[in-house]
């Protein structure tokens, strides 16, 4: 996986997020992989492009899926389904089932397409971006902010679980934890594993994710491994 490399925030605020950019056939022929940011890649052992990789916008490359912010954990089920865990901005960290050639929405969507607690503030689009003071909490009036519902893509896939979805107006600047980011409503999903044994009762077909607070979360999947049907515990 390759994240969006911190574009559109902090010291990189003037660098555009390229999670939606697809390489041209000319770039692939020239082995220019610069469009691979924000992607999950599928690569043959010799480094070449698998012949059955998906074509995205008419181009076959190492890209297996795109529209990612910071996919970290990857896990395959016994029957070959691929799952990923992904860091969001301040909430809406994701667990996804990855499908070939599908678009997972970033930076237009964080978590579900629900217009809650996230809208796309494209700092890099401002003609005087360098002169702006970056804020992780407020978008300047001079930058057009786009709600999630403004964006459409036929191949968009929502996550099967978010950690966590909060409503508009949520206070991300609580100081009770010592540092604001510690109080953000997320578990900072990193590594991911799938449990398919019958040894622990009722745990078969469960995804396991963890990081923040030293807590382990279990996501029980349905028989098709496409839906989380119990509240994570």
Regions found by a protein language model. Name each.
Residues 2-232:
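Beta-propeller domain segments
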């Amino acid at each position: 996986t390759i994240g969006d490399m911190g574009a559109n925030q902090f010291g990189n605020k003037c660098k555009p997020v390229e999670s939606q950019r697809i390489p041209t056939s000319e770039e692939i022929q020239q082995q220019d992989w610069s469009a691979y940011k924000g992607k999950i890649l599928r690569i043959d052992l010799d480094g070449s492009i698998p012949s059955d990789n998906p074509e995205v916008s008419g181009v076959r490359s190492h890209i297996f899926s795109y529209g990612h912010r910071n996919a970290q954990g990857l896990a395959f089920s016994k029957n070959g389904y691929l799952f990923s865990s992904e860091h969001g901005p301040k909430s809406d960290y994701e667990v996804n089932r990855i499908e070939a050639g599908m678009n997972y929405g970033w930076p237009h969507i964080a978590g579900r397409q629900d217009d809650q607690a996230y809208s796309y503030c494209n700092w890099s689009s401002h003609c005087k971006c360098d002169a702006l003071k970056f804020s992780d909490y407020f978008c300047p009036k001079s930058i057009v902010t786009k709600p999630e519902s403004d964006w459409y893509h036929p191949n968009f896939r929502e996550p099967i679980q978010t950690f966590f979805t909060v409503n508009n107006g949520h206070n991300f600047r609580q100081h009770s934890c010592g540092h604001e980011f510690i109080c953000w409503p997320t578990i900072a999903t990193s590594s991911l594993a799938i449990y398919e044994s019958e040894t622990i009762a009722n745990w078969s077909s469960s995804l396991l994710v963890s990081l923040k607070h030293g807590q382990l979360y279990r996501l029980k999947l349905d028989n098709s491994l496409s839906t989380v049907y119990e509240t994570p515990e």
